[in-house]
Amino acid sequence: MVMIVGGLVIVKALVIEIYISESFSLKDKRRVVKSILARCRQKFNVAVAELDHLNDNKKSTLGFVTITNSSAYADEVLDKCLFLIKSEYSVEVISINRERI
């Protein structure tokens, strides 16, 4: 938790590892990952990145970060990112890690 003059800043991160069963090449995987990251960035205004498994055509580790003045709002935004991924993409979420920075 970081204190800034005039208010409180909360930074929360969500790191998920996904398995993309329908991917048969790095090109397939990157298409799916790029779509997930772009949609979450545009829809929920979060910072996003692919963090690991860059050269694996089936797995990817994705990171999402939001900055706000409300812990509940940060959790809500990250939950929406996770729900979007689970409901609109043919991927299996292998692990989920949340962190307050």
Label every model-predicted segment.
Residues 1-8:
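N-terminal amphipathic/basic-hydrophobic helices that include classical n-h-c signal peptides
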Residues 11-12, 49-70, 99:
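Short, charge-patterned binding micro-sites
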Residues 12-22:
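Short glycine-/aliphatic-rich beta-strand segments at the starts of folded cytosolic domains
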Residues 29:
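C-terminal binding/interaction regions
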Residues 66-101:
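C-terminal structural segments of small proteins and small subunits
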